[in-house]
Regions:
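Pyridoxal 5′-phosphate
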Residues: 1-377
Length: 377
């Protein structure tokens, strides 16, 4: 029996109403949210509508519950190593605030601007490793390549072609350097264990593979790093006794909670909690297996129909498939007219298959691309 007919995956697909009307192959840009996520957010706003902030204490308790959930999800040693941020950009900037003075950074030329621009803006020297046929090679990050580098900066999965790195292999060669990871294109699709991979800091959005919607990101910072390089920005909820309102005698929180500063964005945080509960309930290993299966299936079908696939092959696959097509912008518009969502890239279109997708989604794309390729220019 194919995985598409498995009743478990069929039931999970029904959690995503968007799949009724759309062939949704765009989770690398932003995924639709499942019912459990919209219910969590709507429930919060119904409470707010009906009673203002009467549930303030309950909401704060739920925030800490989500912090525990996220910590377990990424393998953090403790919840205090997790902070909530609205997006990856905020998370990376927070990390840069901690490490900008540590020294040069070793990164790669394929990174999304958010990953590198904050370092450059702060005057940090970046050594940019070139890719080799669309792949970031681990030997390029050996200590000998840039002996003065204080930090290794990488994305778990690259946004442009889906190249997925083995974080544990890279962590094993850190050799005293800080290891900073962007996980926006992998969190929710592939396992992450920050301790096993020896990651010092990690940032992720919630609106992509996490299926949590916009505004629900998170950042992990290892306690030792946080204590050695404490953040500078604080607010009224950065202290241990915020309701004393004693501005001259405060005790700062000894955890990453300090960086959240003010009133929490409860809705997005509760959305993230509902998404993590769903993903953890399925099992991230099972999700990864499903994602890779669909990627392999789609790649086979595309290549068989003569569409070149530019994403790296075995050992580097993810949920993204970069397909070479003529006039990518026109192709995206053509597909959207047929209720198929993908993303334009300079070389072609980026297709993202998540666990809620199916073989029929892949077949619909292949058929539509066949129609597009036969259109007169």
């Amino acid at each position: 029996m194919s995985q598409a007919l498995d009743p478990v995956w069929k039931e999970l697909r029904e959690q995503f109403p968007a799949t009724r009307d759309w062939v949704y192959l765009n989770s690398a840009a932003g995924s639709p949210v499942p019912r459990v996520v919209s219910e969590a957010v709507n429930g919060f706003y119904r409470d707010l509508e009906g009673g203002g902030d009467r549930l303030w204490e309950d909401w704060l308790g739920r925030v800490e519950h989500v912090r525990h959930q996220v910590a377990r999800f990424v393998g953090a040693a403790e919840p205090g190593e997790i902070a909530f941020v609205p997006n990856t950009s905020s998370g990376i900037n927070l990390i840069v605030d901690l490490l900008a003075g540590a020294g040069p950074v070793l990164s790669d030329e394929m990174e999304f601007p958010t990953v590198t621009l904050p370092w450059i803006h702060r005057g940090v020297h970046l050594n940019m490793v070139p890719s080799i046929e669309g792949v970031i090679r681990i030997e390029s990050f050996s200590p000998e390549y840039a002996p003065k580098a204080a930090t290794m900066l990488l994305s778990h999965v690259q946004f442009v072609n889906g190249c997925r790195l083995d974080l544990e292999q890279f962590g094993a060669i850190k050799a005293g350097r800080h290891f900073v990871v962007c996980a926006s294109q992998s969190a929710g699709a592939f396992p992450i264990d920050v301790q096993k991979a020896q990651i010092d800091a990690l940032a992720s959005a919630g609106h992509k593979w996490m299926c949590a919607g916009y505004g629900a990101g998170f950042v992990y910072v290892k306690r030792e790093l946080f204590e050695k390089h404490p953040p500078r920005a604080i607010g009224w909820l950065s202290v241990q006794d915020p309701f004393l309102f004693d501005n001259l005698n405060v005790r700062l929180l000894p955890s990453m909670r300090r960086t959240e500063m003010g009133c929490p964005p409860f809705g997005p945080i509760f959305a993230l909690g509902a998404a993590v509960e769903l993903l953890a309930g399925i099992g991230i290993e099972k999700i990864a297996e499903r994602v890779l299966y669909l990627n392999e299936y789609l790649t086979f079908r595309l290549e068989r129909k003569g569409f070149p696939v530019l994403s790296p092959g075995e050992g580097f696959r993810s949920g993204q498939t970069l397909v070479e097509v003529e006039r990518p912008a026109d192709a995206v518009a053509f597909l959207k007219e047929r209720k198929i969502l993908v993303t334009e890239k300079p070389e072609g279109i980026r297709v993202a298959t998540h666990f809620f997708n199916s073989e029929e989604d892949c077949e619909a794309l292949v058929r539509a691309l066949g129609e597009y390729s036969r259109q007169p220019v």
